[in-house]
């Protein structure tokens, strides 16, 4: 039979062992989440459209450009991988710019449009039933005018917003 001191030491030892197992499990889970987040960032191409300003007209124009660009991407982007999507976008920056300019012209808006591939930081975002972790992502960015207004984004590859 164990003495009271031995029983206390045994319970303390078991408690410490469980605490260490729990800490190790939490560390391993956190590490998995970091690794998964890095994989998501590495295998994702985002579409990011930034409005001229936060005015109602600029925000409406941004959504009109979004619709035109997504329609163009639906018919033109054949990518089956992220590198293919980036290569396709790099070869079609001018066409994407023309698409955005044409959409703005339909609204009688004449403002500069800049289309570029960038690598930029995005905060954590909910997307449908999932979450995109914070991190640096490659993005096809379209700036309307100064690009200082609220933005709109989606995941271009893999095609969560369209087929690219």
Task: List each language-model region with its residue ranges.
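Short, Lys/Arg-rich N-terminal segment immediately upstream of the first membrane anchor
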Residues: 1-5
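Solvent-exposed coil/turn segments that connect beta secondary-structure elements
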Residues: 50-54, 70, 118-120, 145-147, ...
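Hydrophobic membrane-insertion alpha-helices, especially the h-region
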Residues: 8-25
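Aromatic-capped interface at the extracytoplasmic side
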Residues: 25-38
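Mid-length scaffold segments of soluble, non-membrane domains
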Residues: 83-143, 147-150
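Structured segments of extracytoplasmic/periplasmic soluble domains
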Residues: 48, 52, 68-79, 95, ...
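Early exported N-terminus immediately downstream of N-terminal targeting peptides
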Residues: 43-90
């Amino acid at each position: 039979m164990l003495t009271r001191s031995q029983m206390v030491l045994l319970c303390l030892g078991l408690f410490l062992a469980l605490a260490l197992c729990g800490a190790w499990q939490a560390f391993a889970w956190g590490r998995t989440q970091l690794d998964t987040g890095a994989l998501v960032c590495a295998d994702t191409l985002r579409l990011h459209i930034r409005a001229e300003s936060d005015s109602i007209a600029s925000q409406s124009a941004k959504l009109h450009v979004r619709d035109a660009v997504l329609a163009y991407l639906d018919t033109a982007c054949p990518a089956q991988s992220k590198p293919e999507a980036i290569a396709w976008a790099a070869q079609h920056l001018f066409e994407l710019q023309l698409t955005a300019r044409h959409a703005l012209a339909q609204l009688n808006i004449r403002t500069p449009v800049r289309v570029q591939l960038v690598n930029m930081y995005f905060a954590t975002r909910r997307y449908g039933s999932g979450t995109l972790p914070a991190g640096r992502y490659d993005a096809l960015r379209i700036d309307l005018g100064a690009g200082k207004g609220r933005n709109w984004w989606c995941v271009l590859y893999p095609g969560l917003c369209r087929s690219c």
